[in-house]
Amino acid sequence: MSKKTKQELENNKLSKRLRHAVGDAINDFNMIEPDDKIMVCLSGGKDSYALLDILRQLQASAPIDFELVAVNLDQKQPGFPEEVLPTYLESIGVPYKIVEEDTYSTVKRVLDEGKTTCSLCSRLRRGILYRTAKELGCTKIALGHHRDDILATMFLNMFYGGKLKAMPPKLVSDNGEHIVIRPLAYVKEKDLIKYAELKQFPIIPCNLCGSQPNLQRQVIGDMLRDWDKRFPGRIESMFSALQNVVPSHLADTELFDFAGLERGQTLKHGGDLAFDSEKMPERFSDGSEEDESEIKIAPQKAERKVINILANKPKTCGA
């Protein structure tokens, strides 16, 4: 097999892996429904480019119809190349809107020199995007956070906030007006890096964020990458844990009625079993066999009809 052919096979495997990971997340959390109008938030980074690209692929083949509109917030950062995103979006034929709001000056004016800008910048950006989604009549807002972002958020909350809280794949906004989805929830960052190289996306660096050393999120990210390198499978196991929460073995009295425990009561996950098998669900394993009686992923709630986004469009009459 030639080197070129081998690389093509690897590229095809990568594209298929990403498409199925996104499709699985959409299916598991019922992220996309018939006739949705989805606002895809495009920053110019690798993650949001990949999100838009994969959603376009699914839009072309899915058994339901949904709209996509790309939205970029031009925050008026010095040196921001304003022409890059419009040129790219016009070249691929995606409807888009560029929203111009000078949040850069606001952040610089409000915060003291040397303070990290991410928190305030994020809040300002979120409010503007919610407003834009309402103006466009969008039913969903799609963000480009991936699996590693979700885990990093969990550790940020644990280490610095005293909360066991991550980043949900799907949520309702604080004002209750918007459904926010994260279709890349099952996708590894290292796969997104490879995909961006493969697709040659015109990446726009975030100078405002990149100029800030020792950010807490950056430190956590370095920790996760180090673990992934030194302990293969650890990241997969940690993400699996987010889908296998056992409230009776934590210490939150609002999640579990410890005060009401009685003798003879049977707990769903065992009363005194503190450490379970090291096996992980098949989705995150290396493909080896597992005992399904020991590992269960996200027990089914009340039955809901969910469209399989990875299925094909129905054939039209005469086709």
From Swiss-Prot:
What InterPro entries would the database entry show?
Rossmann-like_a/b/a_fold (IPR014729), TilS/TtcA_N (IPR011063), tRNA_Cyd_32_2_STrfase (IPR012089), tRNA_thiolation_TtcA_Ctu1 (IPR035107)
Could you say which EC number(s) this protein's record lists? Answer: 2.8.1.-
- Coarse class of the primary localization is cytoplasm
UniProt record, GO biological process:
tRNA thio-modification
Pfam families, alphabetized = ATP_bind_3 (PF01171)
Its pathway, per UniProt, is:
tRNA modification
Q: Where does [4Fe-4S] cluster bind?
A: 118, 121, 209
One GO molecular-function annotation for this sequence? ATP binding
Q: What class of enzyme is it?
A: transferase
What Gene3D superfamilies does the record point to?
A: HUPs
Motif PP-loop motif is found at 43-48
A GO cellular component term found in this entry reads:
cytoplasm
- Ligase found in the keyword field: no
Q: Does the keyword GTP-binding apply?
A: no
Q: Which UniProt keywords apply?
A: 4Fe-4S, ATP-binding, Cytoplasm, Iron, Iron-sulfur, Magnesium, Metal-binding, Nucleotide-binding, RNA-binding, Transferase, tRNA processing, tRNA-binding
The cofactor binding remark recorded in the entry reads: Binds 1 [4Fe-4S] cluster per subunit. The cluster is chelated by three Cys residues, the fourth Fe has a free coordination site that may bind a sulfur atom transferred from the persulfide of IscS.
Cofactor(s) the protein needs: Mg(2+); [4Fe-4S] cluster
Q: What does this protein do?
A: Catalyzes the ATP-dependent 2-thiolation of cytidine in position 32 of tRNA, to form 2-thiocytidine (s(2)C32). The sulfur atoms are provided by the cysteine/cysteine desulfurase (IscS) system.
PANTHER family in the record, alphabetically?
Answer: AMINOTRAN_5 DOMAIN-CONTAINING PROTEIN, SULFURTRANSFERASE-RELATED
Miscellaneous comment text of the record: The thiolation reaction likely consists of two steps: a first activation step by ATP to form an adenylated intermediate of the target base of tRNA, and a second nucleophilic substitution step of the sulfur (S) atom supplied by the hydrosulfide attached to the Fe-S cluster.
**Homology family:** Belongs to the TtcA family.
Q: How does it assemble?
A: Homodimer.
NCBIfam families for the chain: PRK10696.1
What name does this protein carry? tRNA-cytidine(32) 2-sulfurtransferase
Q: Which organism is it from?
A: Neisseria meningitidis serogroup C / serotype 2a (strain ATCC 700532 / DSM 15464 / FAM18)
